[in-house]
């Protein structure tokens, strides 16, 4: 059980499947609502696997320390945080492709995490390099993730909040970029993808304005994590509609010998 700042982490019990977790002062995570409940089979899998693989992030007052990822995963390995993991298609595929990297999937709704748990159950949960957090990703970054601890942060297809009056709700604002940069290790990677041109411009401006982040070209630079991802349902939908997916990548200034060896 982990305490830190305004957050309290515990096994995910007692929540309705469509119950959002309270947000922090920074922009709340822009994850599309998943309003329908989970199935009986998903609930049974949840009850069996969640105590080992999951944490529930709730607002609380006691101070404490961030999640001990070494204890949680049972090893010392590079850690990637995926924000808005949805049903976990990308999460599982990328984790399987990089067994030496540990992945923490964060989402604000239980339904997607339940789908990911079922997918994990099908391939076998023993030794799986994935853990799950049900909660607001900004709160998790603030209170459950230590500074200089992540080799990567992935944000695939966050809600673009297209109306101008809703732009303040977008996840990837300058303040969030600064928080992500603080949590990345030197040479750690921020990988974002969107099919919304306006949001892509917004993300690009916010990332380029963060002094600790620098744009990278994955075709010419050695990165500590893979940036090859499977097509998501949102990407396929965009392609069918004639849209294009825009990939945005930055790395944190600085480089360590460990970072280059973990690939």
Curated annotation (Swiss-Prot):
Gene3D superfamilies, A to Z: Vaccinia Virus protein VP39
Domain of life: Bacteria
Assigned EC number: 2.1.1.33
InterPro entries, alphabetized: SAM-dependent_MTases_sf, tRNA_(Gua-N-7)_MeTrfase_Trmb, tRNA_methyltr_TrmB_bact
Biochemical pathway: tRNA modification; N(7)-methylguanine-tRNA biosynthesis
Transmembrane parts of this sequence: none
Chemical reaction(s) catalysed: guanosine(46) in tRNA + S-adenosyl-L-methionine = N(7)-methylguanosine(46) in tRNA + S-adenosyl-L-homocysteine
Entry annotation: catalytic residues: 159
Positions that bind S-adenosyl-L-methionine: 82, 107, 136, 159
Broadest EC class assigned to this enzyme: transferase
Statement: the UniProt record of this protein carries the keyword DNA-binding: no
GO molecular function, one term: tRNA (guanine(46)-N7)-methyltransferase activity
Keywords annotated in UniProt: Methyltransferase, S-adenosyl-L-methionine, Transferase, tRNA processing
GO CC entries: tRNA methyltransferase complex
BP-aspect Gene Ontology terms: RNA (guanine-N7)-methylation; tRNA methylation
Renumbered residue ranges of the record's region Disordered: 1-39
Binding-site residues, substrate: 163, 195, 232-235
UniProt cross-references to HAMAP family, sorted A to Z: tRNA_methyltr_TrmB (MF_01057)
Function text: Catalyzes the formation of N(7)-methylguanine at position 46 (m7G46) in tRNA.
NCBIfam families reported in the protein's UniProt record: tRNA (guanosine(46)-N7)-methyltransferase TrmB (TIGR00091)
Family: Belongs to the class I-like SAM-binding methyltransferase superfamily. TrmB family.
Note, other: Was identified as a high-confidence drug target.
Protein name, per record: tRNA (guanine-N(7)-)-methyltransferase
Organism of this sequence: Mycobacterium tuberculosis (strain ATCC 25618 / H37Rv)
Lineage, broadest ranks: Bacteria, Bacillati, Actinomycetota, Actinomycetes, Mycobacteriales
